[in-house]
Amino acid sequence: MTILSDVKALGQQIWLDNLSRSLVQSGELAQMLKQGVCGVTSNPAIFQKAFAGDALYADEVAALKRQNLSPKQRYETMAVADVRAACDVCLAEHESTGGKTGFVSLEVSPELAKDAQGTVEEARRLHAAIARKNAMIKVPATDAGIDALETLVSDGISVNLTLLFSRAQTLKAYAAYARGIAKRLAAGQSVAHIQVVASFFISRVDSALDATLPDRLKGKTAIALAKAAYQDWEQYFTAPEFAALEAQGANRVQLLWASTGVKNPAYPDTLYVDSLIGVHTVNTVPDATLKAFIDHGTAKATLTESADEALARLAEIAALGIDVETLAARLQEDGLKQFEEAFEKLLAPLV
């Protein structure tokens, strides 16, 4: 047993927030799964770093440049191959839990963040190209992305809804998921295989707010917000309305804690893992945070601890004139811009 196995026994999956060809081909990813890692997430920034720093791509890049393809098509050829290979490594994990774990995420183009129909079309295409049952298509949680979520769920596609900072937007996502499930059930189709995670970003909240807060509140907002979001989750998915869908095979959306590497070196390096362990959740962690947690993290069900205190802390922050929903909208826009910039950098060498 490892600490990751202990976390899994507490109802939380630990995923790796990284993907590269070397990670898969070296056997390192397979070794991480043996330690208790349950899935993988990727994004444009991760692929940009992989393509720039992993020599295993060089020959394929050269070969793809000789073909009459756009830079985006060249990127997708390599990214789809990597995700497919990672899905194969994670397949045994996926099957051992009846399809509940072992997913690998690939994101739609950041250029489509405000285009619901474009997102749906690209997600369908990427899902078909990967052709693995444990592939998850990542979609940003803009209003357009949430509209796309409903359609993709009704299509039977598993989705990672990303860049969530807002409790209100997260609740909108749950409702869209439920509508997609209801449509699929009304059409007489199975829903048991569909898994959706709602990726709620953590450390960026504290990074954005800490400079404006008194010392006693620094480093506390993100965890308080996550705990409040989990209370919202419990209320939504234990209500009679969703219970009726669950009785017909629907899975609950799982909250996924993203951006859980600490940005402030004054904070413990496992802060955003240790503090957010709970049932029906996922935490996707970068390599350094994973190593730190394995070395000196604590496996304890902490997510429901001090729930009232979390709400009181948010009220205290609101009393200072800080609107966390306004902040959430800004952070999502910033995140979209960062992914767009990473995508442009990623494509530049593929021209």
Swiss-Prot record:
GO biological process, one term: pentose-phosphate shunt
Class in the EC hierarchy, top level: transferase
CDD domains, alphabetized: Transaldolase_like (cd00955)
InterPro entries: Aldolase_TIM, TAL/FSA, Transaldolase_2, Transaldolase_AS
EC assignment: 2.2.1.2
Domain of life: Bacteria
Molecular function as annotated in GO: transaldolase activity
Keywords: Cytoplasm, Pentose shunt, Schiff base, Transferase
GO cellular component: cytoplasm
This protein's pathway: Carbohydrate degradation; pentose phosphate pathway; D-glyceraldehyde 3-phosphate and beta-D-fructose 6-phosphate from D-ribose 5-phosphate and D-xylulose 5-phosphate (non-oxidative stage): step 2/3
Family: Belongs to the transaldolase family. Type 2 subfamily.
Biological role stated in the UniProt entry: Transaldolase is important for the balance of metabolites in the pentose-phosphate pathway.
Name of the protein: Transaldolase
